[in-house]
Each structure stands twice: as structure tokens, then as C-alpha cells.
Amino acid sequence: MKRGLIIVCACLLIVSSFFSGCGTSDTQSTTEEVTQATEEQTTEATSEEVTETQEETTEEAEKASVSEESPVTYEYTQVDDSYFNDAVFIGDSISYGFELYVTEKRANGETVLGEAKFLTSGSLSYGNSLWDVSDESVHPTYNGVKMKLEDAIAQIKPGKIYILLGTNDVALYGVEQTIANADTEISRMLEASPGAEIFIMSTTPKYSPAESDVDGALNNADIDALNVAMWQFAVEKGYNFMNIAPLFKDETGGLAADYCSDKEGMGIHFTSAAYDIWLNFLYSYGKQQ
């Protein structure tokens, strides 16, 4: 098991390294790939930083801890399908693609992610998840009924809630408001299922050639800024953070071509090779019980 701790006073010095790309476009989805991709995110603290960290109290260090060698903020272990029996995955069209990927594997007789459920919808965001349900809203459906996330969570009562949102937030709302909306929505979900573990996954990158200089357009600089802020938010709130974004980056910091299914379009959606990596990551980084 790997575990590394770093505290808030060093956070600002390592975030650019922690959220940098892994520089891979290989399509194999082995544990070795995930290990290599995550190890490239490590950095060493200077003697001056160490001196500063020693001045922190143990309580502050634990509150601000984040793994330096690992892309997650908790003690982790390899898990099997049963671990996900009480899990629900929430997300936008990228996660909807993952739902289709898992559903196809299950239809072919594979046991994938146990009995995990999905609440996904195209264009879903932290922001619009707070809106009232209507014909125009993009809330996901559960048992055939469109409903707010917290209402679906109240019915499912999951023990683990995995969230991948932000792609449809950051360009529209900015980083600060996105974090505020995330705080509101996650609080509502926890009221609906007290005791559930929250796992926030970092927003995944955009294919660099698809980026635009137009004001208000989604770009990787804003995505990276959101991920740093979301990481800090998760640590402060006691939520689990999973930094999956670097697994899919190329040397430019954008979504690697082999992992992008819409290079001529939005440049944000995944190929099956990317979903292979994501699935393997989930099994490799279960939370130590």
C-alpha cells in the first residue's frame, strides 16, 4: 500500500506537478499504466518546506493531508466487484459514456463494478443540478423518472457516491461558484443518504487542438484551476478526492488523442481505451476500510 502525506503549506508549491499530464497515449489498461501515470505526479519537498511543515500541529496536518505519491487523498487498496455494490456514479455525458461502457460489459456476461448504479445525463453540472426539474432540465432519471440528484440518492441510499462533474460548470460559472454549487449539491445528497462516502473525481481534460481562445470557451487552464480548488475543497470538507485527470493527458496537458472520441467536435469525450484506464483505476484505488 502506498501512502504519502503533504500538508496545506506545501500544496501551492506542488499543485502544478500534482495536476500535470502523464504524457501517455497507450491504449492498454493495466495496473502498471496506472502506477506509472500516478508516479510521474510526485515531487519532493525542499528542506525549507520540511521546516515549515514541522511547525504544523498534528491535527492540522491530518486535516490538510493529501497523498504525494498517490492520486487519492485516502489510504487505498485493490478491491473487487463487491466493493461497488453500494456505489452510485454521478456525472455528465462523459460519465454517461462510462455507464454505456459498463452496461455493455455486463450484457456480455462480465461482472463489472458489482451492483453499482448510475445517475448520469448529458450536460449535467453542479449548477444545473440545483435547478427545478422540468421538461427542459437535464436531471438524470432513476427508475424511469427524471428527478433531482438528492431525490434519487434518497431512494438508492448508497454507501459510496462517486462524482465526476465540472466540464459543464467551469466555463459558465467560474471556479469559485462551481465550488459553491458543489458544496450545496453534495450537502443535499448527504442529507438524503447520511454516512455515505463522497468520492470527487477531478474534471478530465479537453483535447488541446479543440481548445478555443473565445471568451467563455472551455479550456484546460480553467479545468486545471478547478481541479486544484476542488482538491482543496474536498480535503477541507473531509471528502475523498481522486485525481484521475492526469491519466488521460498528453504532453500538452490536454486529452490524449488516443483517449478522445470526438477530436473534430467538442474534444472532451472518451474512447473505450480511456474507459479501460478509468475502470482499472477504480479497482486499484478502493478506500481502505
Q: What are these regions, as identified by a protein language model?
A:
Residues 164-168, 190-224:
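Active-site segments of SGNH/GDSL-like serine hydrolases
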Residues 99, 103, 154, 166, ...:
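Sec-exported extracytoplasmic/periplasmic mature domains
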Residues 81-179:
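Conserved SGNH/GDSL esterase-like catalytic core that processes O-acyl groups on lipids
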